[in-house]
A protein has these predicted regions:
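Conserved SGNH/GDSL esterase-like catalytic core that processes O-acyl groups on lipids
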Residues: 1-82
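Loop/turn elements at helix/coil->beta-strand transitions in domains of secreted/extracellular proteins
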Residues: 24, 54-59, 95-100, 131-135
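Low-complexity, Gly/Pro
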Residues: 7, 46-52, 71-72, 92-93, ...
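Active-site segments of SGNH/GDSL-like serine hydrolases
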Residues: 60-68, 89-122, 138
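A general structural detector for well-ordered alpha-helical segments in enzyme core domains, enriched
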Residues: 47, 80-91, 121-125
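Catalytic His-Asp segment of secreted/periplasmic serine-dependent ester chemistry enzymes
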Residues: 106-196
Length: 196
């Protein structure tokens, strides 16, 4: 057993990293309640240092759900998608050879049309991801499509609010994303010629 003690009279601790020389490393930038439009507000020199230190091989962004609660007009969807596009461009400029996967919003709500801009937002984000050089993973489709949230709630995979996943549901989504990423990696590997 080891203890880690950090003492300081000033400054703020932004994070701690524990790594080894092998395996997959995940750097999580939690933005609880965020809509994914603030990455380009961080000074570019800080991003450059972070990229140089971590050497990322993949960027995964998952946003859209928090923004949906306040969207009632197509013009709001267009503005949001435009802001996401600027942030995707930001990542592509910082890491031009690193693939970016944008995970779209989940299905949301238990009543029809509870989130009237959900379909339009998914379509806009999908288009934005492709136009800005990112891949799009359709979380709503993975769940079962429009209206699937009710079944996820019934099966204990989502909270009764019809918006948030339960720990069990979050684990299932994580496993499905992992499988999709692994399939994509295998598909991108060069195949060996058959020695006939």
């Amino acid at each position: 057993d080891s203890d880690l003690v950090i003492q300081s009279d000033s400054g703020a601790l932004a994070g701690v990293e524990f790594t080894t020389s092998k395996g997959v490393f995940l750097h999580n930038l939690p933005m609880r309640g965020g809509s994914g439009t603030l990455f380009d507000d961080v000074p570019r020199d800080r991003w450059k240092r972070f990229v140089a230190q971590t050497n990322p091989g993949l960027v995964v962004l998952q946003f859209g759900g928090n923004a949906l609660a306040s969207m009632t007009q197509p013009s709001q969807v267009a503005r949001y998608a435009s802001a996401i596009g600027k942030n995707l461009d930001h990542f592509k400029a910082l890491m031009p050879h690193v693939p970016v996967v944008f995970v779209g919003p989940s299905d949301m709500g238990l009543a029809p049309n509870e989130f009237p801009m959900l379909a339009a937002t998914i379509d806009a984000l999908k288009h934005t991801a492709f136009v800005h050089g990112a891949m799009y993973w359709d979380l709503q489709a993975v769940m079962g499509g429009p209206g699937s949230m009710a079944q996820w709630v019934d099966e204990g995979l989502a909270a009764r609010d019809g918006v948030h996943f339960s720990p069990k549901g979050a684990k299932l989504i994580g496993q499905r994303l992992d499988m999709a990423l692994r399939r994509a990696m295998r598909a991108s590997q060069p195949t060996e010629p058959l020695g006939l």
